[in-house]
């Protein structure tokens, strides 16, 4: 009989938010992919992921504990700043 698949990380809101943020950072070229490869800048994907985080922040307002609210707020803000910086770097 096959062994059940075990999750690598806990399945909770903070882990999901961190996963989205990490993927956005990879798309922005701010961190390597999980295999260590440096991927090309992908502003479209980064913007989409940042927009998803912003939507989650709005839709979950009042339903998160303090640490979850601080996490999503700070990550969304930092990613928006990084996105603007990346846009400026590619247009100039």
Task: Describe each PLM feature range.
Residues 60:
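Acidic, glycine-enriched active-site microenvironments
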Residues 1-51, 55, 66-92:
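N-terminal intrinsically disordered, cationic/polar leader segments
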């Amino acid at each position: 009989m096959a062994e059940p698949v075990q999750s690598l990380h806990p399945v909770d809101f903070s882990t999901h938010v961190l996963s989205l943020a990490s993927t956005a950072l990879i798309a922005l070229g701010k961190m390597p992919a999980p295999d260590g490869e440096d991927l090309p800048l992908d502003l479209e994907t980064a913007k989409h992921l940042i927009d998803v985080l912003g939507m989650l922040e709005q839709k979950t307002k009042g339903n998160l504990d303090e640490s979850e609210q601080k996490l999503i707020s700070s990550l969304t803000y930092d990613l928006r700043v990084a996105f603007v910086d990346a846009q400026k770097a590619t247009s100039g």
